[in-house]
């Protein structure tokens, strides 16, 4: 009888070790994704944060795995304690990331100093990564002691990782917030402890894990309120926040002004005349305004401005259905009513996918967010403009706007705008750029006019009610010295073309972002997009030769050889993964949802 009981207990322990490995894999991937999404929002959607986060997470897991390599064999009770500590630390970590700007003295809408951001990333990633690495080392060690192999342990842990990756994508697709996903992740982790504690009648651990699980269940029930509370730390006039497959959409409202933030970056606001300037100045270039295609941003004033014109049909393509669903009940009446107008046909689709259909339009207006990320850059590339050109009628026009500078263009801004200009010109021969704090790009297959008398005549004939645009304003825009200066600046650029596989615009946008922390980069001629100068190239070449030389000299040392080969494999693998992630974001724009599947 004793022998049977012993065999039964051993089998239960083997089963528990398998469950532990699956749980560690599940937590490592799903937990990592939840933290990455939170960091992405906390640092305004700059994909560079993903790259730095991967590095710090790997450092944390490596340290944890190294600590766990010692001869110490953890008891099951110790595994349970680390499981519970990981769950608690994980929730605290999310709260820390949500409040990171306030904790480090940041201002609303401003960036933290670069060193502070790095410090924040270290705090957010190293401890939890260390515990994940330690848990894998310990659970794998216990599994191997049951006459199993390390390869099998890794395979089982990978099964958990796949489950975590799938859940990270599916949960967000089902409308579950990232904070709720984080609570689900920790609940699964704690449930494993409860399940295994019941098997061996470990009363203290059973009690502790049950209490933690009850607290997590309460948090899950209050998750929406807590989510809004934490979001309000950075958005005092918050009315709605929702996690979508593309980003986190946050809506604030104050004094009849509604603002939309995507990954905490202001994308649109309702009390502005920018939509009037964009729509009316662009459409003056054509007499044909029967059919219009609006790609994004229609709710930000573009649709009401278009309805002032004698238009027969407006196809409004919105990539983010969740955004419209959350926003409609908070829009001013004139904007909400415009979206319900009989002439307006709202289509929920990716603009690049929609442009594959053989529809033709007199006007295409692009209202997508600024090209501040790889996600947005895909709407300012050569390939995108080719699609737009194919959807235009013979005398149709394409127009979009990007944030710029009215008086001084730095080298980075010049090259960024020029990259977009030449991408546009590769598909539509005639291009005009209107100066201002916001530059309006207008392009067409047919000739565009700069005759202010003709443009003013069209404006008067349309009998429009406007706050800014007038014959005087039209004359000012087309005749001031900035109009000519833009041509000269673009002509002096490197003539790079922004494309899907050569996103020069995104590279310069990253440079513009870095100049906020390192002002001297403002004077760099062409950062991130050109090869190093000859002197620096020689130095780089010498460093590579030196590295190879050291490896050849020490190649007889088995330890050195292993270290170098593992380092090279890890470096190459990480580089390829980063490139693939950025390409995926640039091509599809849904990294926020699919990051788990990509890092798995």
Question: What are the functions of these language-model segments?
Answer:
Residues 2-452, 456-468, 479-600:
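Alpha-helical transmembrane segments of multi-pass membrane proteins
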